[in-house]
Structure formats: C-alpha cells, structure tokens
Amino acid sequence: MKKLSVYLKRYTAQSILAPLFKLLEVVFDLLVPLVVARMINVGVAGQNRGVLVQCFFLLIAMALLGLACSITAQFFAARASTGFAADLRQAVFDHIQKFSFTELDTLGADTMITRLTTDINQVQTGVNMGLRLLLRSPFVVFGALMMAFTINTKCALIFAAAIPVLFVVVFAIMLVSIPLFRKSQAALDRVTCLTRENLTGVRVIRAFCREEQSVEEFDAANQALTRLNEFVGRISALLNPLTYVLINIAAVFLIDRAAIQVSLGSIAQGDVVALNNYMLQIIVELIKLASLIITLTKSLACAGRVAAVLEQQPSMTEGTQTISGSDSREAVAFHHVTFTYAGAGAPSLMDISFQAKKGQTIGIIGGTGSGKSTLVSLIPRFYDPQEGTVRLNGDDVKQFSRAALCAQVGVVQQRAVLFQGSIRDNLRWGNENASDAELWEALSAAQAKEVVEGKPGQLDFQLEQGGRNLSGGQKQRLSIARALVKKPEILILDDSSSALDFATDAALRKSIKHLGYPVTTFLVSQRIACIQQADQILVLDNGHLAGSGTHQALLESCPLYQEIFDSQFPGERLAAKEAGK
C-alpha cells in the first residue's frame, strides 16, 4: 500500500480534512453521555426542569453538528478515494502500455483486467473507509476509556482490561484472513480467465460439442472459489460474536462494580448510565473496526496485486532514435537471431539470418508452429531476441523509439481486430489525419472498396465490437486497409488473407505490389500460391531456416518446400518434369 500512497498526494488536503471532521464528530459523540448523566443527576434527580430543557437542546445541537461533520468527512473521503482510484487506474493502464509482449504473455490479459477493475475498486473502498473510520474507531475507544476514568477509576479499569483482549482477537483474525483473501483473488482470476476463454471461444466449443466439459471445468473453478470464500467468510464472521461476547462479559462486570459504587455513594446513577453508554459506544466502534479491518484486509491484498503490476519493469528499453532515410539498400536484416518465449523449454527461432532489400516482397512459409509469426513479430519489436540482432535500414531496431517503429512498420496479424465505431475511425488508427481520399485509396488497394460502398453510410458505417457485423474476409480486408493508410515502409501481412478467396487474394497482392510508394512486404502464408511470386521466400522448419530463395530455386534445392508444394499441387512438379523431357 505504501507504493500506492503516492497517488494520494494530489488529495492531501482531502485526506487530512476527512479524518479531522470525523474526529470532530467523535468529540460530540463522547460528550453526549456526560450530558445525559447531567440530565439524570441534576435534571431528574434534582427535579430541575431548566437543566432538562437546556440539556435537551444541547443534545439536539450536538447531534446536528455531529451530522454536519460526518457529511463533510464523507464528502472529502469520497473526493480523495475516487480521485486516488482514477489516478491509480490510469497509472496502471499507462504502465501496461509500456510492457512488451513478454510481460503481457506472462501476466495474462484476464489478470490485468481484474487488477484494473475489481482490485482497484476494492482499494478505493478501503481508502474511503480508512479515511473515515481508521482514526475514528480507535479514537472513540480510547476516548471512551479516558472519559470513563474521569467518572470513576475503579469502573474504568474494567474498560482497560477489556479493550486489549478485544484488540488481540481482532488482529489475530486479521492476520489469518489476509493470506486467505490473496488466495481468493487468485481463484477469482482463474474464474475470470475461464469466463473470458469460454465467451470468446464459444463457437469453437459448440463446434466440437465441448459444452459439457466447459461447464464442468468452470464449475470446478467456481466451486474452488466458493469454498475459499466460504472459509474466509466463516473466519471473518467470528469477529462480531467474539467481540459481543467479550463486551457483554465486560458489561456484566461493569454493572456489578457500578452497583457497589452507587450503594457506597461513590458515583451517581447518571454516571452509571454514562459508563454504560461509553461501553455501548465501544461495542459499536469495535464492530465497525472489525468490519473495517475485514475491508482493509481485502484492500491490502488487492493493493499488493496492483502494486505488483506497477513493480513489473518492462523487459525492453525503448530507444530514442527516429528512422530516417538511409543509403543502405537493406530494409530488414536478421543476423543469427535466436528467440525463446518466456517459460518455453526450447527456442522458437534458432540462428536465423537473412536480408530483405528495400521494395522486395519476402514470402515466409512453413508448417504450423514453425516460427513464422514469431519471426515477423521481431521486426516491429514486439519481442527482443535473446541472441543476434534485427536491423532496419542498417540500424538495430533497439535504437528506435516505439513511435518511430510504429510509423514505419504496418502489421496485419492473423486475427483481424476491429474496434467499435465507424469504419472511418478504425481506418484512421493508421493515420489520424488521413483524408477521405486517402482512406478510399487504401480501401481500394486492400480490395475493400466494394465492401464499404455496400454499407449504409459507407465510411460512417458503425462497426460492432470486434467487427461482429462483418464477415471474416471483410474484417481482414479492412485490417489491411488500416495498415496501408499510414503508408508504411515495411508491411507485414501475417497470414492476414486466409479468409479471402484466391481471386481476391491475387488482386490484393497485385495491388500491394504496385502501390504508389516503395514498400518492403513480408507475406506469411500457408499457401504457396500466395508467395510464389515473392522476390525471396523463407522456409521455416521448427524454428530453423530450412531454405531461402526464389520459388523456382527452392523447388530445386529445398526438400521441405518441395514437400509443401507437392501437398498443395499434387502431380504438378512431376508433370512439369515429364513435359521437359
């Protein structure tokens, strides 16, 4: 929580005023039993009606002043806690944006969503209640004790004996609860992860008739969370009954001792009522303190999880250079690159070296899991290789700022991702200042012009979240158009035309080849037909570069490429040989 307290600095005044007004409220509360005692001792016993009326209006005034202090304290506490939560949430979100894909893969999207929402909301609740009650409850308890000593020392000793026992019970339960609340939040992460996984993959689950297994898996995780919460709840539930039992025992001793003191004439009946009122105040405040401790325990556990995100340092150090024009003909070069994903047992890429000249089209092909997507993800520096270097225009990509790389490299990934809003808004992710003419130019090159023209409102057509109101092929073409809007020097198409038919795919490749500006294109595909016209083709096999060259050269020299070709064009290579004879 100490690390997060810096986000309260902007609200220092509110954080001081909230407990201050609560303490003022406490002062009025502690004076009430004394006024009641005076009403009984002087007004009732002495039959002094003037004192009764005076005390009556004094109690009303104190109640109104206490209410005003309470409302003011709540106002300042709410301002401080909501502002703190907003700043903290923004800080965590901004920090996540600095993460490389390595940290994003390690932490997981579901965990970060939980920490940005549920955890920060819980911390906000803890700050709000802490500002209002953390000082109030102990102040009432010790204030009531001091007031009891001013009335009668012997009776006050019962208070002095009961309070430490109550604190021991409360803090013992708190120490047991804190680790359990942390486990509960981890179990909640698991349930959130399964929920997200099942909702996003519902079509696949139904296609394979896996509904029953998904329900069973979710039920197991949900039951584990429920059992843990029930166990924590049972421990937390001990607070109220234990404190009530201890206070009631103390009350019995108090009444017994007070009765003796009254009979001896040491104290008046009104003083006994005041002592009992102070005991009741202690009961109420200790119950509040117990509830506060439960809330703070949850908040501290959540604060630790949020702080863990802020303490996670990005594994990449961002460069500062911009990508300027270079005399180098080399657009992209890999020099003995080896890359391993965090937690993976074996490298995904091993000793990869190649060069791509400016304006060339580079095809990348290989089996599933051969490292095709991993290779192209190193170019925009989504990841850093453990060995070797990746160069753009002759310079190491680590030297460039993220903004510079983003401006020069356009990436269209396997899964087309569109956002809720108009088509125009989505396309302008590539260039927020792009004119409509530039948008239509990119749409035409991506073979998406007819798609947009057929929609009501055309560029103003509203897309649903994730582009749910478009087909797979339409989403892919709009994603390609979005990348083309910023006119990148390097364009990466990571199997991004898999949902297109052969004719549309061929037209797309042709239009990209003849763009009005020079672009180095990387085409990742499972289909030889998509890459056979490339200037250079890279063949990957389990992370190794099995071959590189033109289509014809690989047909003659690369067994793996020959195997892939024969599987997609059976008999064609043999027929060509026969025709050559």
Show which residues each predicted segment covers.
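Helix-loop-helix
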Residues: 47-54, 61, 147-161, 231-305, ...
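Hydrophobic alpha-helical transmembrane segments of ABC transporter permease domains
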Residues: 20, 24, 28-32, 57, ...
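ABC-type nucleotide-binding domain
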Residues: 325-581
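An intracellular "coupling" helix at the cytosolic face of ABC transporter transmembrane type-1 domains
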Residues: 10-13, 98-102, 118-131, 135, ...
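Helix-loop junctions and hydrophobic alpha-helical segments within the transmembrane domains
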Residues: 92, 96, 205, 226, ...
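A short amphipathic helical element positioned immediately N-terminal to and/or at the very start
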Residues: 1-12, 112
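Transmembrane helix-loop-helix hairpins at lipid-water interfaces of multipass membrane proteins
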Residues: 9, 15-72, 76, 149-154, ...
